[in-house]
Amino acid sequence: MKTVTGFASATIGNVACGFDVLGFAITEPGDEVILTLREERSGELPVSITSITGDGGALPRNPKKNTSSFVVLKFLEYIRTNKGIDFEGHIELELKKNLPLSSGMGSSAASAAAALVAANELMGRPCNKMELVNFAIEGERVACGSAHADNAAPAMLGNFVLIRSYNPIDLITIPSPDNLYCTLVHPHIEVRTAYARSVLPRMISLKTATEQWGNVGALISGLLTSDYELIGRSLVDVIAEPKRAPLIPGFYDVKHAALEAGAIGCSIAGSGPSIFAFSSSPETASRVGEAMQTAFSTLKEKLQSDIWISPVCKQGAKVI
């Protein structure tokens, strides 16, 4: 019997202007996946789920429908076909959910990435992370019906990741300033990813597209040159944020509070309802978080929220 534990942290997709093509990882919180290797096959599939905690019973226990087990099944198929590793044993999977579901924090991507690094370690590391990330992306299809990479890629690789192309997949990791801090606030409501995608326009004007492209390019430049002022100017989303903001009570009040407290920029984390803000110091990031939480709690709905302050995670998914 051999046991390996994988960990992958929360991620923030879109990063305001980079809808479906940009995301980054933070250091905490994150999901843990514990895999135990048994020599003898138990059941029809080579993977079974023995335990899921932290999900309130919401996640499927069927290995073909749960993101973490689904990606391990795909990984095992791949190494049999492409690496000559014919796995005859059985893997028991335990998932510890530390990320809230439907939160905009890359919950499904974290589970998939953690499971994959653990499975890769268990099998003797036959794959590199660029190979593994393809399975994590497919895991998103199981979770929300769309194989988007803006959470899966940074969850696996760390840092900021730009998805230049989906067909074929072409990922570019982007370094970021050491003193760039993220404040992430999660109000205690849910926004389903599938629904948040359904409210988006199917077509946009050339004028809107041009404005969005300009912000994406400028944001990348700001990250590469540690130009915090440019980073802040570029965190403008003219496509998704206007349509998704009504799904988050008090979004503009919270955003205003963050900017007034010193944040260089603020937007919706992924599909929401979490909101993120960037600051250039941990002290400012903490002050921004307090202001955002206060803004949520003083709404008519008096929303409670959780908060995390974190630098950008440079490593990505790892074995712990």
Curated annotation (Swiss-Prot):
Q: Which PANTHER family match?
A: HOMOSERINE KINASE, HOMOSERINE/4-DIPHOSPHOCYTIDYL-2-C-METHYL-D-ERYTHRITOL KINASE
Its Enzyme Commission number(s) read 2.7.1.39
Q: Name any Gene Ontology BP term.
A: threonine biosynthetic process
- Sorted alphabetically, which SUPFAM superfamilies does this protein's record hold? GHMP Kinase, C-terminal domain (SSF55060), Ribosomal protein S5 domain 2-like (SSF54211)
So what does this thing catalyse? L-homoserine + ATP = O-phospho-L-homoserine + ADP + H(+)
Say which family it is in: Belongs to the GHMP kinase family. Homoserine kinase subfamily.
Q: In which pathway does it act?
A: Amino-acid biosynthesis; L-threonine biosynthesis; L-threonine from L-aspartate: step 4/5
HAMAP family (UniProt xref)? Homoser_kinase
Report which gene this protein is encoded by. Answer: thrB
Short name of one Pfam family: GHMP_kinases_N
As for subcellular location, the record says: Cytoplasm
Designated name of the protein:
Homoserine kinase
Write out the GO MF terms.
ATP binding; homoserine kinase activity
Q: Which UniProt keywords apply?
A: Amino-acid biosynthesis, ATP-binding, Cytoplasm, Kinase, Nucleotide-binding, Threonine biosynthesis, Transferase
